[in-house]
Amino acid sequence: MKSARPKSVAPKSGQALLTLGALGVVFGDIGTSPLYSLHTAFSMQHNKVEVTQENVYGIISMVLWTITLIVTVKYVMLVTRADNQGQGGILALVALLKNRGHWGKFVAVAGMLGAALFYGDVVITPAISVLSATEGLTVISPSFERFILPVSLAVLIAIFAIQPLGTEKVGKAFGPIMLLWFVTLAGLGIPQIIGHPEILQSLSPHWALRLIVAEPFQAFVLLGAVVLTVTGAEALYADMGHFGARPIRVAWFCVVMPALILTYLGQGALVINQPEAVRNPMFYLAPEGLRIPLVILATIATVIASQAVISGAYSLTKQAVNLKLLPRMVIRHTSRKEEGQIYMPLVNGLLFVSVMVVVLVFRSSESLASAYGLAVTGTLVLVSVLYLIYVHTTWWKTALFIVLIGIPEVLLFASNTTKIHDGGWLPLLIAAVLIVVMRTWEWGSDRVNQERAELELPMDKFLEKLDQPHNIGLRKVAEVAVFPHGTSDTVPLSLVRCVKDLKLLYREIVIVRIVQEHVPHVPPEERAEMEVLHHAPIRVVRVDLHLGYFDEQNLPEHLHAIDPTWDNATYFLSALTLRSRLPGKIAGWRDRLYLSMERNQASRTESFKLQPSKTITVGTELHL
């Protein structure tokens, strides 16, 4: 399949709209990090940092250079060039590397682990973002503290409740709102910088190095808070397919990066002048009369950040389903214009329950900060490893990348391992559950395919029998029948049962196999390969549909593009009733887990967009 990159040249008005759209979707997570990151750095559990000028300069320097190296250099300048037909994200990178010889197995495992860690990020981001915004109420009045939890829960319930409606209409406002948010961040930081211009010294990396040399253990633990400033960096890469690399780069360099630098410098200057502001430096930046509007704006910004990661979870899950890493799930489109706007009820329900539990267990953004880092840093390290495999560049460039980016990321990850007992176990638990689910689904599907192959008739033998006289006893139906099937050299079980048990033989038999390509989209003109296996009186046609992992598996639509006379075809699906050969109490947990997922996955009638009135399901019992 040919790779088709999105055109990078577009009218200026179009580029401006894409850049504004990127502000609303891509940068919500990293844009709300100032709400909690610096506060967390000075109140790290078991390692409280004294508020001195040297410590503030050192921490701000660590923050600014972490953003520069990881977000600007790694993601914006380097990793966004590793696209798969314009699409980004860790699974897109894995798809690019699938056929890299001896790296193939490692790449698959790394991609699975990265995807699993991302789900941990998706659970924590809405919780910590909304909590940090509502905690601004305590800056207005300490008596408002009792409202933080109920208000946070109410906001989160609203976020998940509106998911079935989609964000097509309100999504248009996300960009302007986030632009206002970034302008606000910059505007709040500038007066403090003017009042304490010495804070600009922290732009020099020597302050970070000085802190590391003077207090190595404290600096190491501080990295666990510093990483909070780059949460959402992966979104720059993952959402590249929606906006393109150029608008993301423009938004970063022209709006987001300057705003973040100014607000962190401003928070640092404020903390030096007013050490008591370390309790919540983001909200203390605002004049007293503007704190209520700031809390409202911050809450809206965190809602947008939450929506972005939830949408990312839908997108990643759809990729995983199409790549056969997860069972089929119901996917509903919430927009007639935007293909990428989808809603997955099961994913939404699981995320809702998980986020509610996390908020009720941790109850504050400070407590959740300990849980956040491992999910973020684990993904950072995995993307770096996969990127180095992808570029396969000269040794000195690899060494430079490792020194400037690899070593800092490993240190960030190592620092967060010290917080496993304080909450870091949460993303590890989520990732472990997801890996078990994905590996079990792969393992079980392979076993089913092996057992199924033994029951299926070889294609050549079936074609021979069509010419044999005993077929006269079969009832001929002068219509078209379509049989979706997973392989090209055997006959679908539904077709075998149709002929053997139902004594039916259709005038035209179309056997359709979906070939999942490791690209986001396959151009319509390159999707179908058709071969006529048998002519009159019974015509047998084999169709291979090559689809990308973002392409819809809409069989009637794809087959109409090949032959409109197939529009009224009857579809036959093979339904396997799986049983374990061992009694329920003896069967292994893996067997039971796979059988449970297989029984509860979405029906292929819905996945293939078939009309129930034109679909016949033929059952077969299979023992594993």
From Swiss-Prot:
Q: Which reaction does it catalyse?
A: K(+)(in) + H(+)(in) = K(+)(out) + H(+)(out)
Keyword annotations from UniProtKB, A to Z: Cell membrane, Ion transport, Membrane, Potassium, Potassium transport, Symport, Transmembrane, Transmembrane helix, Transport
Broad class of where this protein is predominantly found: membrane
Q: Which cystines does this chain contain?
A: none
From what superkingdom does this record's organism come? Bacteria
| GO annotations of cellular component type | plasma membrane
Localized where?
A: Cell membrane
Family membership = Belongs to the HAK/KUP transporter (TC 2.A.72) family.
Alphabetical list of HAMAP family matching this protein: Kup (MF_01522)
Spell out the protein name for this chain.
Probable potassium transport system protein Kup
**Organism name:** Corynebacterium glutamicum (strain ATCC 13032 / DSM 20300 / JCM 1318 / BCRC 11384 / CCUG 27702 / LMG 3730 / NBRC 12168 / NCIMB 10025 / NRRL B-2784 / 534)
